[in-house]
Amino acid sequence: MMKRLVVLRRREPAVRFSCCGVRYGECRRNHAASTGGHAVDGCREFIAAEDGGGGNSTGAVGVAAAALKCAACGCHRSFHRRVQVYEVAWDDDCDSGDTSSSSPSSSSSLSSE
């Protein structure tokens, strides 16, 4: 006796997501880990530290290291929560139906005045 296999094909969604960038949120470093407690500093967002430019001979290495240090709390960027920011792309088929119905109403309201 043979079993039948049914395959259902689904249409792709009209919305596509693409990753635009990365943002770093609140600091999650536990400052009381050595004593067995839990204490965070309350830094809400990663702010890259700027290099002071005080005659550092390391040049680009010093600038890169400063970009990974938070100016607000002094922690490394890896302690901050990483948040990926997505861009939503819509298909033109969905938008064309809405714009065609709204454009005559706006033109008719202009002509009636």
Curated annotation (Swiss-Prot):
<dbReference type="GO" id="GO:0003700">
    <property type="term" value="F:DNA-binding transcription factor activity"/>
</dbReference>
<keyword id="KW-0862">Zinc</keyword>
<dbReference type="GO" id="GO:0008270">
    <property type="term" value="F:zinc ion binding"/>
</dbReference>
<dbReference type="GO" id="GO:0050793">
    <property type="term" value="P:regulation of developmental process"/>
</dbReference>
<keyword id="KW-0963">Cytoplasm</keyword>
<dbReference type="Pfam" id="PF04770">
    <property type="entry name" value="ZF-HD_dimer"/>
</dbReference>
<dbReference type="GO" id="GO:0005634">
    <property type="term" value="C:nucleus"/>
</dbReference>
<feature type="region of interest" description="Disordered">
    <location>
        <begin position="93"/>
        <end position="113"/>
    </location>
</feature>
<comment type="function">
    <text>Inhibits zinc finger homeodomain (ZHD) transcription factors, by interacting with them to prevent both their nuclear localization and their DNA-binding properties.</text>
</comment>
<dbReference type="GO" id="GO:0000976">
    <property type="term" value="F:transcription cis-regulatory region binding"/>
</dbReference>
<keyword id="KW-0479">Metal-binding</keyword>
<dbReference type="InterPro" id="IPR006456">
    <property type="entry name" value="ZF_HD_homeobox_Cys/His_dimer"/>
</dbReference>
<keyword id="KW-0863">Zinc-finger</keyword>
<comment type="subunit">
    <text>Homo- and heterodimers.</text>
</comment>
<protein>
    <recommendedName>
        <fullName>Mini zinc finger protein 3</fullName>
    </recommendedName>
</protein>
<dbReference type="GO" id="GO:0005737">
    <property type="term" value="C:cytoplasm"/>
</dbReference>
<feature type="compositionally biased region" description="Low complexity">
    <location>
        <begin position="97"/>
        <end position="113"/>
    </location>
</feature>
<feature type="zinc finger region" description="ZF-HD dimerization-type; degenerate">
    <location>
        <begin position="24"/>
        <end position="83"/>
    </location>
</feature>
